[in-house]
Amino acid sequence: MPHFPPNAYFCTMQPSEELKNHIETEIIPRYESFDAAHGTDHVRTVIAQSLDLARHYDVDADMIYAVAAYHDTGLARGRELHHIHSGEILLADTELRRWFTAEQLAVMRDAVEDHRASSDHAPRTIYGRIVAEADRC
């Protein structure tokens, strides 16, 4: 996997600097404790791929960035239900309310829950479809 330096997202779709700062300091470091396949390089790759895919759709860059950043955070509670736990972690982060409405957060939770490749259903939103596809790259 390629290594992406912090804040290096190579597309025209850019999330807000304040949101990036929060995620870079509070969320991405959590991936350091996960297995090598789900470490910081992985999450940075998924973020970059998600932003690249998202530029083809009418979607919110901040939402895509956050969904991609949180998609595997639930691994801290175990692999089997990590997609559900990741959604819970996203909703529990009260800082996100600075950038997102309750409705946006619900869409983001659904997208995080739906990213899993082994899921028996298709992602419910375009956000879930984008991050699920980026996670497979």
Predicted segments, located by residue:
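Intrinsically disordered, low-complexity cationic segments
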Residues: 1-5, 21
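Short, positively charged and aromatic/hydrophobic N-terminal segments
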Residues: 3, 9-12
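Intrinsic disorder/low-complexity signature
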Residues: 4-6, 38, 132
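A general marker of short, structured functional hotspots
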Residues: 5-6, 27, 111, 123
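Acidic/His-rich, divalent-metal-binding segments that scaffold phosphate/diphosphate chemistry
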Residues: 12-81
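Divalent metal-dependent catalytic cores for phosphoryl transfer on phosphate-bearing substrates
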Residues: 57-137
